[in-house]
UniProtKB/Swiss-Prot annotation:
The gene is esr1. Keywords: DNA-binding, Lipid-binding, Metal-binding, Nucleus, Receptor, Steroid-binding, Transcription, Transcription regulation, Zinc, Zinc-finger. It comes from Sparus aurata (Gilthead sea bream). One of its GO terms (molecular function) is sequence-specific DNA binding. It is found in: Nucleus. This is Estrogen receptor.
Length: 581
């Protein structure tokens, strides 16, 4: 494409190229802007595809694939909407580019560019201090709602949020709204689906940091208040505050847990209001599972134990996911997370079973399609006593009219209280950060007391109910010990197929017990607890009789987590051991 000749008529020059004729605006004294609002943005065309004429005073402006090529001179009479001479396709990480002030409907910028660009990149470059200030103003405008990812209208209730989420959170905290999720408390909340589930939307509001007070104490507001006191500007503090405000919600929560009050993640958990704790606990509840196993009646000992151990293995996976959602649990060390779960897993499963069976007298609801009564559990040797204790505790729950908020608090207390006192003579190591676990336990206990205080009863009745609820935990611990002994005896008799995750938890509990018989454990059991072993040895532990106890391998806990530190991962094998007829 080379120009052959040019003709000027009425201020418009016509250039004849080999492939066609194009018009461009020649320099005229009239300050008429040539920019049209109907031509949005620029597209990244090759630099040498449509080069300017040889005079070098013109600059190419692409208006889209279907529009003719228009050349506009770089004169001082350009429209104020014109982009600076440096184009987007020249943008690199080493040269900061300032976005133009074109409205969002005309200038499309991807969300990744808006979120991924930090405030520190908007420094004064080749365009001067004026362009740097304009870029900084645009960076402040490019905010997204931390809840639904829509465009944020401002800093509301401690986070950047849109008008819709701000109004929703305001209505929720002013009124008494008992939202219930119709699904599994894991609904996706975005711009299009934020109105589909109010419970998950409110839960996400609390997760991203919305607070009733309206101001996060550890955010940039403190920075501006200190700046007004001293009257001086600290550039390092300002950049740190801006980076904190523009970080994603996950990074903000990590920053809060590591910098609040000098106490790590403990301060953020302690300062959490009781209503928020209760909402997080209810949102962390796992869904009700299905057995999906068709077994002919009447049940036999092998079929009942196979059904129960299969359901227990499935529930263990969901129990680990539930524990991760507890406030402050992921801030614990991996050793403490594993130890708490291994010490309380059967108690947690039992209180969940009792809660599901609270409205069905005489029956235990293990799953939606697995409901057993005492007569069906009596076919297993030693199971009738455990069934009677479970049904009696469910009757006690029903008599006390246990509420969902009280149940989730008791369930979390069982998990955290299991590591409060380490065994003196066992192989169980003490918790690395027992103070953090105690702080979590105190926070959840305060939430339970706060909920009881809102019942409107007298102080004496409130104190009595607190004692009645906490006394239930001793019964659940007693049932757990009975169930553990029964499950281990079934394993030794080779009457039940133990799945890998269930076997790991069972063996870990036996290793942790101080009163276990020393002669029943081999040298392999005295190896370090948290080591990865071959799964075939653990599956073969049910070979029969007392020899199975001697060859039982320890729990297989994968410490090298691919998802980062503080995330518990237990190795789960999909193929269980087949029962021996």
């Amino acid at each position: 494409m080379y120009p052959e000749d040019s003709r000027v008529s009425g201020g418009v020059a016509t250039v004849d190229f080999l492939e066609g004729t194009y018009d461009y605006a020649a320099p005229t004294p009239a300050p008429t802007p040539l920019y049209s609002h109907s031509t949005p943005g620029y597209y990244s065309a090759p630099l040498d595809a449509h080069g300017p004429p040889s005079d070098g005073s013109l600059q190419s402006l692409g208006s889209g694939p279907n529009s003719p090529l228009v050349f506009v001179p770089s004169s001082p009479h350009l429209s104020p909407f014109m982009h600076p001479p440096t184009h987007h396709y020249l943008e690199t990480t080493s040269t900061p580019i300032y976005r133009s002030s074109v409205p969002s409907s005309q200038h499309s910028v991807s969300r990744e560019d808006q979120c991924g660009t930090s405030d520190d990149s908007y420094s004064v470059g080749e365009s001067g201090a004026g362009a740097g200030a304009a870029g900084f103003e645009m960076a402040k405008e490019m905010r997204f709602c931390a809840v639904c990812s829509d465009y944020a209208s401002g800093y509301h209730y401690g986070v950047w949020s849109c008008e819709g989420c701000k109004a929703f959170f305001k209505r929720s905290i002013q009124g008494h709204n008992d939202y219930m999720c119709p699904a599994t408390n894991q609904c996706t909340i975005d711009r299009n689906r934020r109105k589909s589930c109010q419970a998950c939307r409110l839960r996400k509001c609390y997760e991203v940091g919305m607070m009733k007070g309206g101001v996060r104490k550890d955010r940039g507001r403190v920075l501006r208040r200190d700046k007004r006191r001293t009257g001086t500007s600290d550039r390092d503090k300002a950049s740190k505050g801006l980076e904190h405000r523009t970080a994603p919600p996950q990074d903000r929560r990590k920053h809060i847990s590591s910098s609040a009050g000098g106490g790590g993640g403990k301060s953020s958990v302690i300062s959490m209001p009781p209503d928020q704790v209760l909402l997080l606990l209810r949102g962390a509840e796992p869904p009700m599972l299905c057995s999906r196993q068709k077994v002919n009646r009447p049940y036999t000992e092998v079929t009942v134990m196979t059904l129960l151990t299969s359901m227990a293995d499935k529930e263990l996976v969901h129990m680990i996911a539930w524990a991760k959602k507890l406030p402050g649990f992921l801030q614990l060390s991996l050793h403490d997370q594993v130890q708490l779960l291994e010490s309380s897993w059967l108690e947690v499963l039992m209180i969940g079973l009792i809660w599901r069976s609270i409205h069905c007298p005489g029956k235990l609801i293990f799953a939606q399609d697995l409901i057993l009564d005492r007569s069906e559990g009596d076919c297993v040797e030693g199971m009738a006593e455990i069934f009677d204790m479970l049904l009696a505790t469910a009757s006690r729950f029903r008599m006390l009219k246990l509420k969902p908020e009280e149940f989730v608090c008791l369930k979390a207390i069982i998990l955290l209280n299991s590591g409060a006192f380490s065994f003196c003579t066992g192989t169980m190591e003490p918790l690395h950060d027992s103070a953090a676990v105690q702080n979590m336990l105190d926070t959840i206990t305060d939430a339970l007391i706060h909920h009881i205080n809102q019942s409107g009863c007298s102080a004496q009745q409130q104190s009595r109910r607190q004692a009645q609820l906490l006394l239930l935990l001793s019964h659940i611990r007693h049932m757990s010990n009975k169930g553990m002994e029964h499950l281990y005896s079934m394993k030794c008799k080779n009457k039940v197929p133990l799945y890998d995750l269930l076997l790991e938890m069972l063996d870990a509990h036996r290793v942790h017990r101080p009163d276990r018989p020393a002669e029943t454990w081999s040298q392999a059991d005295r190896e370090p607890l948290f080591t990865s072993r071959n799964s075939s040895s653990s599956s073969g532990g049910g070979g029969g009789g007392s020899s199975s106890a001697g060859s039982t391998s320890g729990p297989q806990v994968n410490l090298e987590s691919p998802t980062g530190p503080g995330v518990l991962q237990l190795r789960v094998h999909p193929h269980p051991m087949k029962p021996t007829e």
